[in-house]
Structure formats: C-alpha cells, structure tokens
Amino acid sequence: MKIYLINPKTPENFWAMRGALDIVGKHKTLMQNTALLTLIALTPGDLDVEYIYCDENIAPIHWDMGCDLVGITGYTLQFERMGFISARFRERCRPVAVGGIYATINPENAKKICDHLFIGEAEYTWPQFLRDWVNGSAKVVYKQETFIDIKDSPAPDLSYIKAKNYHYFSLQTSRGCPNNCDFCDVVRVTGRKYRSKSINQIMLEVKNAHAFGAETIFFSDDNFVVNRKFTIELLQEIIRWNRTLDMPVSFSTQATVMIGADEEIVKLLADARFRVIFLGLETINKDCLEEVNKGQMVQYDPFQVIPRISRYGIIPFIGMIVGFDHDTPAVFKEIEDFLDKTASPFASISVLNAPNHTPLYERMKRDGRLIEDFRGFWHLTTNIIPKQLTPHELYFGQKLLFKKLYEPEHFERRMIGWLKNVKYFPDIYSTRKKDLFRIVMIIKIFYHFTLRVPAPVRMMFWNILKETWKIDPRLISRAVSMLLQYWHYYDFSHKESDEKMGLDGKDGAQVPDESILMGKT
C-alpha cells in the first residue's frame, strides 16, 4: 500500500514569519507538521505500507504520483488549499483521506472533499483504517468518540523531513485545557481533561528532535502549564539534559498569564531556555473576560504578571482580541497603552470570532448576531455583528492598531522597555559556542537592516543596539534575534493593512484616520 501524505501550503499570515525567514535564508518554513509524521509512526508493523511525505511549504506536489491513497491534513487557514488538492487527485481517480483540526471542527464541509474522513484524534482510528483498507472494508468516516490516552501517541517519525528546512521543531507534551472559554474550539478538539505524556516520553522526543538537528523546539500544547508539579519536574529534566550539550536547545510554548504569578515556574522556564511564551491574554477588561466565560483569569493582574515574566528574560508574546460585547471605541487606545506600560514588544491583535459549535457561536446565532455565510479569514474579519462598535470601527480599528504597534518609534519604545526590565541571566550554562551559521545569520541581519529597509526602521535598528549595549551587552544576541522577528511583523502589517485591507486608498476605498484609535469616529 502506497500513501502520499500532504501538508498543504499555508497562506501568508501573521504567524508564518516569512519576512524573517527570507532574510536568514537557511529555513524554508517555520515548523514541520507533527500530525502526519505521527500517522507514519502509528503504522502497524505487520502491514506493508510505504509513505511519501510532501510538505508543500517546502516542495511542490507531484500531481501524477503513483499511489493507492492521498492523505491530507490542515487547519482552517489551509482548507481552501485542501479542497483544491483533493479535487485534483480525485480527478485522477486517487482516493483521498482528510483529517486534522479543520476536519474535526467542520466535518460537514470536510466530508464533501474526501473519500475517507477522520474526525478527532487519529491514534486509534488510523491503524484501524489501514487494516480495514488492506481487508477491503475501509469506511467513509472514522470518528474517535472518546479522547485517547495520549501516552499511546508515539513520537513523530522525523526521518521523512530535513531539519535545515524548518526554523522550529514542533512537539507536544499534552492535550486538553481545563478552561472552557466561549469563543475557543480547542476543547472540542482535545477536551477539557488535561492529558500529558510521561516525562520519559517527552524527553525521548526532545532528544530525538535534537539528534535530527533541532536548535529550537516549540511545544504546541494549548496550555503548557496546567499541572504545576508535572511542569516543574519536566522543566528540571530539560535543564539537566540541556546542560550536557555544547549548544543548548531553546524552547517556546503557549500558556496563560497565570504563569506570571508563579515565580518558581518562571525561573525554571528561564533556566530551561524558554525564549518566547505566547500568552492568550485576550483583553484587559474584566467584564470582557466574564462575558466569554474566562473569569478565572480576572484574579491575575496583567500589569504585574507580564513584567515579572520579562524580568527573567522571557519574551511575553501577548495575544489580544477586539470585538467583545463590552469593548467600546476606546479599546484600541487601551490596548496600545497597556502594551506600552508593560513593555511588551510583540502582540497579535485579532478580531473576535465565533467558531462553529462553540458556546459563543450558539449565543450569537440565538441573538441574531451571527453572519451565517461568513467567508472571511479569522484574523481579518468576523462572523459576529459587534455590539458597542460599528463594523467600521472594529474592522479598521484593528487594522490601524496592528500597523501602529509595529511602526519603528512605537516598537523601539516597547523593546527598550523590555530590555531594561530583564534582570535575570541564567548562569548554569557554559558559554555557547558560535557556529558558522549563526555568524552568517548575524551578518545577513546587519546587511538587511543597513541597506534594505526604510530609513526609520534602519534608525530604530541602530538605536536599539546602542541602547542594548548600554543596558547590558549580554542582551545583544537577544536583541538581534528580536529585531529579525520584528521585521516580519513590520513587513506583514504594512502589506496586510495597506494592500489587502483597503488602507492605501486604491480603488476608491475610504482611508480611515487614526481618530479611530483614540475612540473617536
């Protein structure tokens, strides 16, 4: 049996880091698709199955590939491409299997583009499907009715990829989130019960990724810190292992702001070389948190916990959402001021959406505020009719704020503030050896910011480096890496806002002024 597994090309988006990757030139895309590589590892040893793996972000699809089955996975952002790929292969009489996040959340739509549909986790259903296929009894739909024991999930088979193509390696230590936020569809995919792999399993996967060439590992858990005792033990194990390496591995992950209230956890994260943590703050308005069933976060003051994370040299990447019922036109200025006061360099600004089958979706539908035929992208528009903001205020306010945050003068102020906040430098590692690639990367970054950027960005670059040297020379390397990351967000915010969002005045579009950001229209 020959199976062609395809990870569809991801459209250009805020998270893709295309601008930064293009400068360095070593990596072709941000991270590998863990799901498909896990499917390969799930194959029963007594079956004769040959896999061909294609990451379309790395290499083109071979449309005339001789195979018995095509397997496609994908997120919501990839669904349009998933449908196109499936149609092309079905025209060639190749049966197609589809699974993943989108298929689980929107099975009705996914079923239309495939011959075999996988809903939910596939650790148990994929091996069963392979056996059914061999026996000639494969079903149309395979649905995992209960959440699996994640300890049964094997390490992804990394032998099908090349480390040089990826900036990060993505691994998963746990699934499930005990929270039940009204707008979040995670609990439908992974459940509310927290399930973790064993520490031995996780460390084997980390060591395996490192052996394949991983320099940075992203733990894709929706909430990395749920079981405090488990997290402490895992971080201690990572530290012990990392200290044995000539070139220690760096990490990043996702969590809630509650970690900032736990200084022991924050210090361990810093000692384990966690460089960036995405924090789903969403809003600083307590009423907004209550309205979407996220009241458990009200007790944590973001003005205190976020600077505490920064003090340990960890970059807090703040996830903000606009468009809650309690949001007024003042929300954009409030977010800007908050990011300034907490010296948070990086932030995403999304518009509140109601994914299918979430409590928010049902509430908006019941209240007559749901746009049923919504065809937009989650990070650009919304399927909700806002309450205290006009669609114009919400739509353009988000775009203008997003663009403003990454203007040189505003980013420079926040980044220098962050650098000044850093007080802790782990002294448990020997001086990191300088590899040739890192030297070449730094040269490329300096070349880019010296010769290929607008004058205000170039001035910001040198201002930040001079200030960094004054604050603490040990932060120079971090500053250069952050500036590389910054370029992607600056470049993307200009392209996305001006060209795609009608902020450039082309085609007769009205260009809104920044009074929206001051709560005035």
Each language-model region and where it sits:
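Radical SAM enzyme core and accessory elements
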Residues: K2-L5, E12, G25-K26, D48-I52, ...
